[in-house]
């Protein structure tokens, strides 16, 4: 079977990801681009006698740029192999913006097939597009699709299998008359005949002209020293405008001509209902009300809608534990499988429905176009804290995970903005905290719904999200006033159209993220659960063909816990909670599996029950409950602020290029966590809430 590598390229919000999901389905994997940690999505399309490997490049408005993720597309296309081609995704409603990028790719001499999206919107708005004339103007093969419904995808797959579908085209636009004449004579003298060689020549000329947008000498270095000297001498004697801005102007002239000949807009693109929605969502007061209502709805749904699948998973794990218990004879293997592996890993798997709902909700906000509006709205608020709206997307991304959120700060050109965002991103409630929060909230805040509608647990979870935002903004202001004093950058963005999210695209997005969560967290949880099981059961002795394990208080882990208990008792924590805090430094969700293993070891031989029920039943020596609302609140606040994630600290070091900033991050967050938990628990005791 033949193989072909294809790069999927386009502007942000052009339908590129939806098209990628339509083509590849579940045949996807994620990784990183070589040399950087920007996420790379790859997928496979199987056609008769042909396997297409598609790489989804980061969405960008052009080639090159200051931010590192913007350079990725440029570097990949520049270093592509001869047989690698491009599918360029062009938004039919934003031709002017999309054609600027496409013309740059044509200049590079890359074989390209154009996919024109938004077919449904064209028809709905009665926009007339002359596809035949557009093909003729560009000299490329173009296929019109509806990426959401899949209309036109079969025609696209037919074209993908044909080599002639990917076409090279000579530069379509022209420089000014002096520059064009000079370039023509140079090409003749240097015997340049290919697109690629002409592209390198024009880049070298821009470099020699000291273009601020091009400070890379590698294009000039492609030529022999004699040629370099010749080019330098020629440019010194002639005042020519070889510059990026000039390119943009001359491309725009051609683009306006193409658009005027190929597309006709009988009605305004922006519909009145969209304008009315923007008046609400972007309103300085109503906009924030809508944002917090949406967040409140999310956290209510995490408990209301996920309860049934959570119970089913919990029952399934319990049933599996009981089956293994009936099949295997008593001994270390049985205990390891039931309490260590199933008890540890299963305790986190139970929370997958709620994590999936979180990813689904964020996906809906992003695909609908609301997330960009939330960024625009937050720019006003964040400006008061020394940040711009550019920081909002990475901060909101922290609701999934702080690691990609910190990597996402590469889109922020202002160094002070970027470093501040990196330092405060871990304060936003992430998906790793969800299993911890949900366990604590479900254990100590199991009250009837307010007014019979509003779930108390959902309200507490929303409060934790809101608290994380407020504290992150507060520390952003502190950092901007003390350490990163450079002026904040301006925030300019294009608001995408409102779209009805694609169910298929949402499914693939949620599936991929849940799979990634289980793959990364599950491996860590499995290893730590096995180690904890060993430490909580040993020392043990084998006597009369029977294994006799130590009581958990006298086991290795129990001894460590008892030593640290006096230090954490003022925070309201016992030794088991202390051990779970220690292990959760590897990954926050490990706290849940740690408690499951510790409590499972303590109650060996008893009937299996849910971890929440076990925690509620736990008593101190004086008969009072270990898990009270005050203890739960103290623990929630500790996990809200503590730097309990090695991966976050590692990526902070990588992105800042210094050990100083992850050290500062760890110290300020851990100090804040200990101080807040201590203050709340001690005040609660004084007020009689123990």
Curated annotation (Swiss-Prot):
Presence of keyword 4Fe-4S: no
UniProt xrefs under Gene3D superfamilies: P-loop containing nucleotide triphosphate hydrolases
Keywords: Cell inner membrane, Cell membrane, GTP-binding, Ion transport, Iron, Iron transport, Membrane, Nucleotide-binding, Transmembrane, Transmembrane helix, Transport
CDD domains (UniProt xref): FeoB
PANTHER family membership: FE(2+) TRANSPORTER FEOB, FERROUS IRON TRANSPORT PROTEIN B
Its job: Probable transporter of a GTP-driven Fe(2+) uptake system.
Similarity comment text for this entry: Belongs to the TRAFAC class TrmE-Era-EngA-EngB-Septin-like GTPase superfamily. FeoB GTPase (TC 9.A.8) family.
Protein name: Fe(2+) transporter FeoB
Gene that produces this protein: feoB
């Amino acid at each position: 079977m033949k193989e072909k590598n294809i790069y999927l390229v386009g502007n942000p919000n052009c339908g590129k990801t939806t098209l990628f999901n339509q083509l590849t389905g579940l045949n996807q994997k994620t990784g990183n681009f070589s040399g950087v940690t920007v996420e790379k999505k790859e997928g496979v399309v199987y056609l008769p006698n042909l396997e297409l490997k598609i790489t989804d490049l980061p969405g960008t408005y052009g080639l090159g740029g200051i931010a590192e993720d913007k350079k990725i597309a440029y570097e990949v296309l520049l270093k592509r192999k001869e047989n690698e081609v491009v599918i360029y995704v062009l938004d039919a409603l934003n031709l002017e913006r999309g054609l600027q990028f496409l013309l740059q790719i044509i200049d590079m001499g890359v074989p390209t097939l154009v996919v024109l999206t938004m077919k449904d919107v064209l028809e709905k708005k009665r926009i007339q597009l002359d596809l035949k004339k557009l093909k003729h103007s560009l000299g490329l093969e173009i296929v019109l699709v509806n990426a959401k419904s899949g209309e036109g995808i079969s025609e696209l797959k037919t074209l993908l299998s044909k080599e002639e579908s990917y076409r090279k085209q000579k530069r379509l636009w022209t420089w000014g008359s002096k520059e064009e004449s000079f370039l023509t004579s140079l090409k003749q003298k240097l015997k340049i005949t290919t697109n690629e060689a002409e592209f390198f020549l024009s880049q070298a000329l821009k470099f020699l002209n000291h273009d601020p947008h091009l400070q890379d000498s590698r294009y000039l270095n492609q030529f022999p020293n004699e040629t370099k000297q010749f080019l330098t001498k020629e440019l010194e004697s002639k005042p020519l405008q070889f510059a990026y801005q000039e390119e943009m102007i001359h491309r725009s002239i051609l683009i306006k001509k193409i658009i005027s000949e190929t597309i006709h807009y009988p009605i305004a693109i922006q519909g009145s209902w969209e304008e009315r929605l923007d008046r609400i969502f972007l309103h300085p007061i109503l906009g924030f009300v809508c944002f917090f209502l949406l967040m409140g709805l999310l956290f209510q749904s995490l408990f209301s809608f996920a309860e049934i699948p959570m119970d089913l998973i919990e029952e399934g794990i319990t049933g599996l534990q009981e089956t293994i218990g009936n099949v295997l004879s008593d001994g270390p293997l049985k205990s390891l499988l039931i309490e260590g592996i199933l008890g540890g890993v299963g305790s986190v798997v139970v929370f997958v429905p709620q994590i999936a709902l979180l990813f689904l909700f964020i996906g809906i906000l992003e695909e609908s176009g609301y997330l960009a509006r939330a960024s625009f709205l937050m720019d006003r608020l964040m400006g008061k804290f020394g940040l711009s709206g550019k920081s909002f997307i990475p901060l909101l991304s922290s609701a999934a995970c702080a690691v990609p959120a910190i990597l996402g700060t590469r889109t922020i050109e202002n160094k002070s903005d970027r470093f501040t965002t990196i330092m405060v991103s871990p304060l936003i409630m992430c998906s790793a905290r969800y299993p911890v929060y949900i366990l604590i909230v479900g254990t100590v805040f199991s009250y009837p719904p307010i007014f019979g509608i509003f779930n108390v647990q959902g309200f507490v979870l929303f409060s934790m999200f809101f608290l994380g935002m407020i504290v992150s903004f507060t520390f952003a202001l502190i950092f901007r006033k003390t350490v990163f004093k450079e002026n904040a950058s301006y925030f300019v963005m294009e608001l995408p159209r409102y779209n009805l999210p694609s169910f298929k695209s949402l499914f693939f997005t949620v599936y991929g993220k849940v799979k990634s969560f289980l793959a990364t967290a599950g491996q860590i949880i499995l290893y730590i659960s096995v180690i904890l099981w060993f430490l909580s059961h040993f020392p043990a002795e084998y006597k009369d063909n029977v294994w006799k394990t130590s009581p958990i208080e006298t086991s290795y882990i129990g001894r460590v816990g008892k030593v640290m208990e006096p230090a954490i008792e003022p925070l309201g924590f016992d030794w088991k909670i202390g051990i779970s805090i220690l292990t959760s430094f590897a990954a926050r969700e490990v706290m849940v599996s740690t408690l499951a293993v510790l409590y499972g070891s303590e109650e060996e031989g008893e009937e299996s029950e849910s971890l929440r029920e076990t925690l509620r039943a736990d008593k101190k020596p004086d008969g009072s409950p270990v898990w009270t609302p005050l203890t739960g609140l103290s623990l929630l606040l500790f996990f809200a602020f503590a730097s309990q994630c090695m991966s976050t600290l590692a990526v902070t070091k990588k992105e800042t290029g210094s050990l100083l900033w992850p050290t500062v991050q760890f110290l300020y967050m851990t100090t804040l966590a200990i101080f807040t938990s201590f203050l709340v628990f001690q005040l609660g005791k004084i007020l009689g809430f123990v």
